[in-house]
Amino acid sequence: MTLQLPCKIVQTLIKCGEHGLIFLKMKLDDMVWTKNELVDIISTEIVKVHANIFKCRLEDIEIIYVNTFLS
């Protein structure tokens, strides 16, 4: 896990029991300054994009890797 805070770009590799490995890249409008903010954003994105679209159960999702950038 490589965290550069503050950041505006977040890359996350997640593993879902049904769909295997999935790469999520988020370009944020606002800066993320803390790890707590980062966790909230990643959690929200996983629920919004992966759980709701692919109908994967949250219990089956595992975060493998997180990388953040400023620009």
UniProtKB/Swiss-Prot annotation:
<keyword id="KW-1035">Host cytoplasm</keyword>
<keyword id="KW-0693">Viral RNA replication</keyword>
<comment type="subunit">
    <text>Interacts with host MAVS; this interaction inhibits signaling pathway leading to interferon production.</text>
</comment>
<comment type="similarity">
    <text>Belongs to the metapneumovirus M2-2 protein family.</text>
</comment>
<protein>
    <recommendedName>
        <fullName>Protein M2-2</fullName>
    </recommendedName>
</protein>
<dbReference type="GO" id="GO:0030430">
    <property type="term" value="C:host cell cytoplasm"/>
</dbReference>
<comment type="function">
    <text>Mediates the regulatory switch from transcription to RNA replication. Acts late in infection by inhibiting viral transcription and up-regulating RNA replication. Plays a major role in antagonizing the type I IFN-mediated antiviral response. Interacts with host MAVS and prevents the interaction with its upstream partner RIGI in the signaling pathway leading to interferon production.</text>
</comment>
